[in-house]
UniProtKB/Swiss-Prot annotation:
Keywords from the named record: Cardiomyopathy, Disease variant, Ribonucleoprotein, Ribosomal protein
Protein name per its UniProtKB record: Ribosomal protein uL3-like
Species of the source: Homo sapiens (Human)
Keyword Ribosomal protein attributed: yes
Top-level division of the source organism's lineage: Eukaryota
Gene: RPL3L
UniProt GO BP: negative regulation of myotube differentiation; regulation of striated muscle tissue development; translation
UniProt cross-references to Gene3D superfamilies, sorted A to Z: 3.30.1430.10, Ribosomal protein L3, domain 3, Translation factors
Outcome when changing residue 308 to V: In CMD2D; uncertain significance
Assembly mode: Component of the large ribosomal subunit in striated muscle cells.
Region feature (Disordered): 1-35, 387-407
Length: 407
């Protein structure tokens, strides 16, 4: 019998305890990037929805590496990011105990998909949310008070954040209730931030005004839920030998006799997945525009490159599984991210200043795969499939409609 190594590193990370279900569905930003007044005023985060994954082909441009100027096939994630709507401004003052909310000002008109978030049952409610806040914009006294509030923000506040919500009507979901989030404004003075937010109330903010091509960002989301799992699946502990009594996928020793209790560091069965996680340094491969009009023509070739000039959309044949079509702006991120399909994803500007070759590398894609994700796809576009497979019966019926003869 061979020698057994009696010392081994523990299984599982203790830095994320307790492994329980997250009480929030949307990723929360707990730390914002450091403010730089020398930069123009800008948002520091954005909201999107995970659509699915595909792969790309590109040429690596990192001087000094052996793989430089070689082609690489890399997996990417598509996050659909319709424009956000600014509906409010929040000012924070600095106190000895941290930041405290000073003033909150909402816009005059709020859409129903935003107001639905404040009701548990929208259908049975009286739908009177924000009626008093909206009246302030209409009478003379209310307008004067609003100007005083904006002036007080400029005078006393240290941090300015805007309240934004997503547009569910632009997405292929049944859900009508929008996701609402506070996003911090960085850059410029406090007066410039308040003026920026005041000028964009009830207006849309696109994703390309927040992030840029080849930028490194952070992704905050809730992971895919996997229910109650055993200790082997949850903590990746070693399976016991075959002849072990009463099961193999267990932990044989759960601690000493004394202290007479099971310690918190002992691997146990329980909830796996649906945890709040922040993943740093995700590279943006492309920020694509949805279908739009240019010179009177509808442009949908947001998956074309300088090498692959085929007019094709980022949506693969048959759509993304369990999601559908991507008909809005999108962000293409390198690798995988947390969450399942249709999960709301929080994209935040990176907290760090990056100087590595990999972080500052300019991304130039040669090819983006748009084959069907339901099986072993081989065709990039529907036209390519039709040219190879031949016309279907429905296409022939459209071209030569049958003429009914007189009886």
């Amino acid at each position: 019998m061979s020698h057994r190594k009696f010392s081994a590193p523990r299984h599982g990370h203790l830095g994320f305890l307790p492994h329980k279900r997250s009480h929030r569905h949307r990723g929360k930003v707990k730390t914002w990037p450091r403010d730089d007044p020398s930069q123009p005023v800008h948002l520091t985060a954005f909201l999107g929805y995970k659509a699915g994954m595909t792969h790309t082909l590109r040429e690596v441009h990192r001087p000094g590496l052996k793989i430089s100027k070689r082609e690489e096939v890399e997996a990417v994630t598509i996050v659909e990011t319709p424009p956000l709507v600014v509906v409010g401004v929040v000012g924070y003052v600095a106190t000895p105990r941290g930041l405290r909310s000073f003033k909150t000002i909402f816009a005059e008109h709020l859409s129903d998909e935003c107001r639905r978030r404040f009701y548990k049952d929208w259908h049975k409610s009286k739908k009177k949310a924000f009626t008093k806040a909206c009246k302030r914009w209409r009478d003379t006294d209310g307008k004067k008070q609003l100007q005083k509030d904006f002036a007080a923000m400029k005078k006393y506040c240290k941090v300015i954040r805007v309240i934004v919500h997503t547009q569910m009507k632009l997405l292929p979901f049944r859900q009508k209730k929008a996701h609402i989030m506070e996003i911090q404004l960085n850059g410029g003075t406090v007066a410039e931030k308040v003026a920026w937010a005041q000028a964009r109330l009830e207006k849309q903010v696109p994703v390309h005004s927040v992030f840029s091509q080849s930028e490194v960002i952070d992704v905050i989301a809730v992971t895919k839920g996997r229910g109650v799992k055993g200790v082997t699946s949850r903590w990746h502990t070693k399976k016991l030998p075959r002849k072990t009594h009463k099961g193999l996928r267990k932990v044989a020793c759960i601690g000493a006799w004394h202290p007479a209790r099971v310690g918190c560091s002992i691997a146990r069965a329980g909830q796996k997945g649906y945890h709040h996680r922040t993943e740093l340094n995700k590279k943006i491969f492309r920020i694509g525009r949805g279908p739009h009009m240019e010179d009177g023509k509808l442009v949908k070739n947001n998956a074309s490159t300088s090498y692959d000039v085929t007019a094709k959309s980022i949506t693969p044949l048959g759509g993304f599984p369990h999601y559908g079509e991507v008909n809005n702006d999108f962000v293409m991120l390198k690798g995988c991210i947390a969450g399942t399909k249709k999960r709301v994803i929080t994209l935040r500007k990176s907290l760090l200043v990056h100087h590595s070759r990999q972080a500052v590398e300019n991304i130039e894609l040669k090819f983006i795969d748009t084959t069907s994700k339901f099986g072993h796809g081989r065709f990039q576009t529907a036209q390519e499939k039709r040219a190879f497979m031949g016309p279907q019966k429905k296409h022939l019926e459209k071209e030569t409609p049958e003429t009914s003869g007189d009886l």
